[in-house]
Each structure stands twice: as C-alpha cells, then as structure tokens.
From Swiss-Prot:
Organismal lineage: Bacteria, Pseudomonadati, Pseudomonadota, Alphaproteobacteria, Sphingomonadales
Pathway info: Amino-acid biosynthesis; L-histidine biosynthesis; L-histidine from 5-phospho-alpha-D-ribose 1-diphosphate: step 6/9
This protein's record includes keyword Amino-acid biosynthesis: yes
Listed GO biological process terms: L-histidine biosynthetic process
NCBIfam families the record matches: PRK00951.1-5 (NF002109), PRK00951.2-1 (NF002111), PRK00951.2-4 (NF002114)
Protein's recorded name: Imidazoleglycerol-phosphate dehydratase
GO cellular component: cytoplasm
UniProt family annotation: Belongs to the imidazoleglycerol-phosphate dehydratase family.
Keywords attached to this entry: Amino-acid biosynthesis, Cytoplasm, Histidine biosynthesis, Lyase
Transmembrane regions: none
Organism encoding this protein: Erythrobacter litoralis (strain HTCC2594)
Length: 197
C-alpha cells in the first residue's frame, strides 16, 4: 500500500499525519477547529484516502498556525505516499454541486506547485474557523505535495455549501489523480521520465 507518515513538531504546533492512498476513506481527525475537522473528513471520505490527523496547536494565539501547519504536513504525507508517482493518473478534475452551489476543481500532480483560488466568502467565520484561512489551507497542501491546483466557485451563496463543495471537489479530483492506471505499466506519467522541475 502507498502510505505516508509525517510528524511535525514546532514551538507552535505538534502534528501527526498518516495517509493511505489505497484506503477506503476512513478518517480520524482532531485539529481543535471543528469546521476544519469536518472538511478534512469530507476530503478523506470522498477521495477514499485514509487520513489520520492529530494536531495540538497554539489556538490561544489564533488559528493560522494550526491551519497552515496541518495542511503542510498533509501535503508532505501525500507526497511521501506518492513516491516517484509511477503509474498514477496524475490529472484529476471534478464539478461539485451542493444545493445552490457549484464549484470546479482541476489539478495536476506535476511536482510544480501552483494554486489558483477563485472563490470568496461573505462571512468571516464558518463555525469558529476563519474563512480567510481556507485559501491558505489549499495553497499550503498544494505547495507541500507538489500539486498544480485550480479551484473556482462557479456560483453559490451559502458559505457552508461553498466550502464543502470545494473540499469535495478537491477530494474527487485527487481520487482520480492518485489512482493507478494499469495500462501505464508503472511508468512515470511524463515524457520527461520524471515529475517536477
């Protein structure tokens, strides 16, 4: 199985992340931020990537360090699990509807991190989570995992639906991208013979 495990300990956060790309969408998530937990659980369930995420962060300061560091560690764990990326689909895309909301996510596990995030929120918090941190979470995951990531809200008004639609779209796109394609015979999905750089 393709698995990754990252322990990241700083003066601001203590984090343990484990992922299994060949999982069933099982999760055990505790970040101290309820809405972030809910979104990571959605990611796991709809990508079928098993995720354990345990975070002890300095939430008495604010939510930035916990959000950023957990995303970095998740991206690193995904990168470790992907290894040399031999045989993967590499690309993934999904339209993700949720009631009045529709979002689109497209990504390339290219080894060249880049994020385009075209979505906004009309309220400052979802639960207790600062909505300004949502874009930063995706940027941090993409940077650490080496993913080119494009996220676009096509339309929608309910902030909860917008966020959940984006996370589910990301999950479904990742499921496509990490799945192994037997026709590739274990080859690296690039004419260069490697991904990144």
């Amino acid at each position: 199985m393709r698995t990754g495990r990252i322990e990241r300990n700083t003066a601001e956060t203590r984090i343990l992340i484990e992922v299994n790309l060949d999982g069933r969408g099982n999760y055990d998530v505790s970040t101290g931020i309820g809405f972030l937990d809910h979104m990571v659980e959605q990611f796991s369930k709809h990508s079928l990537i098993d995720v354990t995420m345990k975070v002890d962060g300095d939430l008495h300061v604010d939510q930035h360090h916990t959000t950023e560091d957990s995303a970095i560690a998740l991206g690193q764990a995904l990168g470790e699990a992907l290894g040399d990326k031999a045989g993967i689909g590499r690309y993934g895309q999904a339209y993700s509807p949720m009631d009045e909301t529709l979002s689109r996510v497209a990504l390339d596990i290219s080894g060249r991190p880049y994020t385009v995030f075209r979505a906004g929120f009309s309220q400052e918090k979802l639960g207790e989570w600062d909505t300004e941190l949502i874009e930063h979470w995706f940027q941090s995951v993409a940077q650490a995992a080496g993913i080119t990531l494009h996220i676009e809200l096509l339309y929608g008004t309910n902030n909860h639906h917008i966020c959940e639609s984006i996370y589910k779209g990301f999950a479904r796109a990742m499921r496509q991208a990490v799945e192994l394609d037997g026709r590739k015979g274990g080859a690296i999905p690039s004419t260069k013979g490697q991904l990144g750089g």
